[in-house]
Amino acid sequence: MPDLLSIYAESQPDKPAVVDDRGGGDVVRWTYAELEAEANRLGNALVSLGMTHGEKVVWCGPNSRQVVAVVNAARKAGAVAVPLNYRLTPDEALYVIDNCDASIAYVDAEHAPMFAALRDRLGKLRQVIVYGGTPPAGMLGDDFVAGFSPKPPEEAEEENAGATMIYTSGTTGKPKGAVRRGRPGDAAVVGLLGLIGYTPDDIYLTSGPLYHSGPGGFMGGALALGQTIVVQRKFDPEDWLRLVDTYRVSSTFSAPALIRMACSLPPDVKARYERSSMKRMIANAAPWSLALKQQYLADFPEDSLWEVYGSTELGVNCVLEPKDQLRKPGSCGKPAPGVEVRLFDAAGDEVTGTGPDHPGELFVRSTVVFDEYYKRKQSYDAARRGDFHTVGDIAYRDDEGYYYICDRKNDMIITGGMNVYPAEIEAVLEQHPAIYEAAVFGIPSDEWGEAVHATVVPRPGASLSEQDVMSFSREHLAGYKTPRSVSFADELPRTGSGKILKRVLRAPYWAGQGQIA
């Protein structure tokens, strides 16, 4: 299996690989030779701790040069890299770490105390390596890693090398580990990067959290081409513009909610920063409204906006090119290179008609589709139809072959680029002693695209306020999953079979929004 990082470390050793810019002059640059050495030291450290091929190393922390290193180190050691969302509560994190059977954890110092508190409940976790600060008692630190050789570890077995596992919640509310095995030189990936126009000379800015498949995947593509990657630790709109200006950024991947923040800055603030270098704004994670597209195109080069549709499990499935952004508003584009898309109706028949009156569940076939849900074969099989796989989105196709996502079969909410699954929140809310049942769904939000809303049925005689519900949620859920608003009802609308009619609940909020409720 070719190790592109090692190749670039030899062919362009002095080229900047990672620029970790935290603002205020706090900047650390690693060349390709330095990134290779750091990844090798960490890979050798993992091997020294008994990590064998196919074992899991979970990493946790905001965007940083160390995150870039650990992803490569895991691959070099033949391990499976598992990103952990650092915004999860301890109980949520515990489930992921335990379920993936992690052997080693690589954690930034800020989140090391959470791992220390959970350590006694994680019998399969052998050791924790802490970076960027002093480790708690019983854990290892940067000095441990620094003592290892900068030469590559023994070559990993091809079966496991380059594998990743990213957790994505499902309709049960429990996260599922989507495993994708390494496929160097995959034709679909190469075709996508070629279509978008990636070049080795690009300066790529990563600002979305790298524990997500989109930011992590496109950063991986940039690294595979030998680009320079600028890392923003956490998104801040003006700082994002500063980075674009300072480094003459030409490519980036972002959620619409983040770009809305940047484009909504006062004109005098935006005027301080040069933006003409941007050639490829790759957008995903939520639909772009026509108004936001127009706002973006007024602030950035008009041929720079690329919209992609995909998921953690299925990779990139459709692409809307710059020339179609205003011509095809609401579309997610045509199938990406190497991707075959089909629509099936509820009876399992393929939908051949076009237009909004002919929707179907969207299935794809591609070499970039994930390989399994870890320990969840039944869930994996249930989402397949032969060689085609679905995540439950409902779509239609127009006469020119462009696809439009019109509903989410599983009611997933996308708020600020974060995937939120109502079943998980409902399960938490219904633990409140005053709540009889709850229905959670997304409502329009100018700031976040969608906001989490809960409709709650109180228990008879119970006294319950909106603040009570929100406070309880904050205690048990990550902040982005907490409902932003709450309404109360005597009962929830249901079908004849007893299923809650969330479409009925959503409809008043989405009226006039141009989207199917």
Residues of each region from the PLM?
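Conserved AMP-binding A3 loop
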Residues: R29-A33, A163-A187
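Conserved pre-ATP/AMP-binding loop-to-beta segment of ANL
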Residues: P13-P16, P135-P136, A146-Y167, K174, ...
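Conserved AMP-binding/adenylation subdomain of ANL enzymes
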Residues: D186-I203, S207, Y211-S251, L265
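Gly/Ser/Thr-rich phosphate-binding loop
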Residues: I166, A224, S250-F253, C263-K328, ...
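Conserved AMP-binding/adenylate-forming core of the ANL superfamily
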Residues: D14, V18-S64, V68-N72, T89-L94
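AMP-binding/adenylate-forming catalytic core of the ANL superfamily
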Residues: V67, L88, L94, A105-V107, ...
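A short helix-loop-beta submotif of the ANL/AMP-binding
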Residues: K56, P62-V82, Y86-P90, D98-I104, ...
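Structural core segment of the AMP-binding/adenylate-forming
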Residues: S6, S48-L49, N72, K76-G147, ...
